[in-house]
């Protein structure tokens, strides 16, 4: 048995659940792949905040706190979504859908991780970072999961704000404040989330429809969805270029090249739908992960090298 995207892959034998399966179930609840992507954005934000001179211990402590916060939020999300996870093929093998972990135990686990993350960040970084993490968990679980997700096709637009917070937490851990580069990084991820998520939802439209989740591809035509994907992709790239005001030439060059590539894929998807051709939205979903990773890795290297900024702002 192995873990993939918060799922348990493999069969749990009948009868009592083995200890190993239970442990894998708890790990799966935290959605490790999602956490991995969130943490990829935290380190570059911290390096940019102090142009590469950040204390490695502070980075480690912030990552631990961020990991605990994301794991807690994801677990509580799984608890709230246990009913619809059973109805979707993409999620039917998650631990709660298969009863590998009791729902009450998962709730306690998620709450414990969330509380621990708050006090960890408070103790090792500062109060602002701790409060940002706590607010993110509350927003993701109470606003996105319990309210927006099942009620509006714009759920991922507003709910995606939670996924933007690691850059704010990372920045505030270093500076104790929130400044404009942190807000621009927030916008990069905020605008990136809809095309990333809607591309996946296009592939699993029937799943969301069966679960009663009004994702945009469920309630709108493919042409409308891909047009929205294109708009948000342009906004994403524009935000990455705006961040170049605070970086050196390396980040700016990578942002231009990667942005051109990301836009080309979004335009290709939109053009294919307009022509009535079969399209592969999952390709855009997967490559959007690579795009975000490349841009933020370039930011990390640019900041670590303390390259001279292109503009004085």
UniProtKB/Swiss-Prot annotation:
TM helices/strands, residue ranges: 34-54, 56-76, 105-125, 128-148, 152-172, 173-193, 243-263, 291-311
Protein keywords: Cell membrane, Heme biosynthesis, Membrane, Transferase, Transmembrane, Transmembrane helix
CDD domains: PT_UbiA_Cox10 (cd13957)
Membrane topology: Multi-pass membrane protein
One Pfam entry name: UbiA
EC class name: transferase
InterPro entries in alphabetical order: Protohaem_IX_farnesylTrfase, UbiA_prenyltransferase, UbiA_sf
Pathway where it operates: Porphyrin-containing compound metabolism; heme O biosynthesis; heme O from protoheme: step 1/1
GO BP field: heme O biosynthetic process
Gene3D superfamilies per UniProt: UbiA prenyltransferase
Source taxon at top rank: Bacteria
EC number(s) per entry: 2.5.1.141
UniProt subcellular location: Cell membrane
UniProt keyword Transferase, yes or no: yes
Reactions the enzyme catalyzes: heme b + (2E,6E)-farnesyl diphosphate + H2O = Fe(II)-heme o + diphosphate
GO molecular function: protoheme IX farnesyltransferase activity
Main location group: membrane
Family: Belongs to the UbiA prenyltransferase family. Protoheme IX farnesyltransferase subfamily.
Additional note from the record: Carbon 2 of the heme B porphyrin ring is defined according to the Fischer nomenclature.
Function: Converts heme B (protoheme IX) to heme O by substitution of the vinyl group on carbon 2 of heme B porphyrin ring with a hydroxyethyl farnesyl side group.
Protein name per UniProt: Protoheme IX farnesyltransferase
UniProt source species: Mycolicibacterium vanbaalenii (strain DSM 7251 / JCM 13017 / BCRC 16820 / KCTC 9966 / NRRL B-24157 / PYR-1) (Mycobacterium vanbaalenii)
Upper taxonomic lineage: Bacteria, Bacillati, Actinomycetota, Actinomycetes, Mycobacteriales
